[in-house]
A protein has these predicted regions:
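Hydrophobic h-region of N-terminal signal peptides that target proteins for export
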Residues: 10-18
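Outer-membrane beta-barrel pore domains
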Residues: 23, 30-46, 65, 82, ...
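Short, low-complexity, polar/charged sequence segments that are solvent-exposed and flexible
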Residues: 46-50, 123-127, 163-164, 175-178, ...
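Loop-centered beta-sheet repeat module
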Residues: 155-201
Length: 313
């Protein structure tokens, strides 16, 4: 069944920051409220139209001493099971910084998957790929990061609970990442093995690339997914891209696209299900009214058009 979705939203986001003089405690409050209209095959989707409260986050982080630091983000508008307040906790982790090269992290953290769309905070995204919409990206685990002497490259190794451990089957994910910062070119790449059933894995190759040209930048991501049951390249993959330009200190304009496809019969991909081939195209602007480049308050206006087949319920 072919589905066509058009969305037009007016978005306002407010960021309030409160911090003590000490570096030990830094407290932030984030919220985002939208007015949106969504249509499916020309008919208004009433449940997804009107005023919506999207995010209400509390962020607490700080530096304890030269070696120890912590970070915590709680999503106050996210439902959680009665027995697990962690369901609404995006992350809470402790970091030990051995020296300028090595650091170690433990707690609930972001699953180490490459790509700029995946790396950005959800509050800063307006429409996303089908993969992004369905990946449970915060899990308990441990990681270590090595940064080169010049500071241009960092390599992360992580072991954490699998994003697909829905039935508490003791499943794990193994992730390797490269963060590169080289002037006009930056990167967030990863290779991943995510256990979706006992002893069965789905493998990712995720290549996030950012190209900078003056006030403009192009973020282009490619992700390929495969299990032992289907061919490795291009049968199950996603492409995400965004071209943006800061017109001045207060106005940013952007165009964005994503393409998700799964032409396999494998049950391993739980984010982009078999039979999916969907494209999203859109554009928008961000306006920051406060002076001196202050981004604690912003307004958004954007439109998105989606078409294709979606195997996800």
């Amino acid at each position: 069944m072919k589905k066509i979705i058009c969305t037009l939203c007016l978005v306002m986001s407010v960021l309030c920051v409160m911090a003590q003089d000490s570096k030990v405690v830094n407290l932030q409050l984030e919220t985002r409220m939208d007015y949106q209209r969504e249509y499916l095959d020309g008919e208004a989707v009433k449940a997804n139209s009107g005023f919506k409260g999207k995010y209400l986050n509390v962020i607490l982080n700080g530096t304890i001493n030269e070696h120890w630091s912590y970070s915590y983000r709680q999503r106050l508008n996210k439902a959680h099971a009665d027995q697990s307040f962690f369901d609404a906790t995006d992350w809470i982790h402790l970091t030990y910084r051995l020296n300028d090269n090595w650091s170690f992290n433990g707690g609930k953290q972001v699953v180490g998957i490459g790509g700029y769309e995946y790396d950005r905070a959800p509050i800063d995204l307006y429409f996303c790929s089908e993969y992004w919409n369905n990946i449970p990206c915060y899990q308990l685990g441990v990681s270590t990061t090595y940064t080169t002497n010049k500071g241009n490259d960092s390599f992360l190794a992580q072991i954490c609970e699998s994003p697909f451990n829905f039935q508490n089957e003791d499943l794990y994910a193994y992730n390797l990442m490269w963060y590169g910062s080289h002037g006009w070119f930056n990167s967030i790449w990863s290779v991943n093995a995510q256990e979706f059933a006992p002893g069965k894995f789905i493998y990712y190759l995720a290549l996030g690339n950012e190209f900078r040209f003056g006030n403009a930048k192009l973020q282009l991501d490619f992700m390929n997914r495969a299990t032992d049951d289907h061919a490795f390249f291009l049968k199950d993959c996603s492409v995400m891209g965004e071209l943006s330009c800061m017109v001045n200190k207060k106005l940013n304009v952007f165009g964005r696209m994503s393409y998700d496809v799964n032409k396999t019969n494998s049950v391993g991909d739980m984010c982009v299900l078999p039979g999916t081939e969907i494209t999203r195209l859109g554009a928008g602007l961000e306006y920051y009214p406060l002076p001196e480049g202050n981004r604690n308050l912003r307004f958004h206006l954007y439109a998105c058009h989606s078409y294709g087949k979606n195997g996800n319920p």
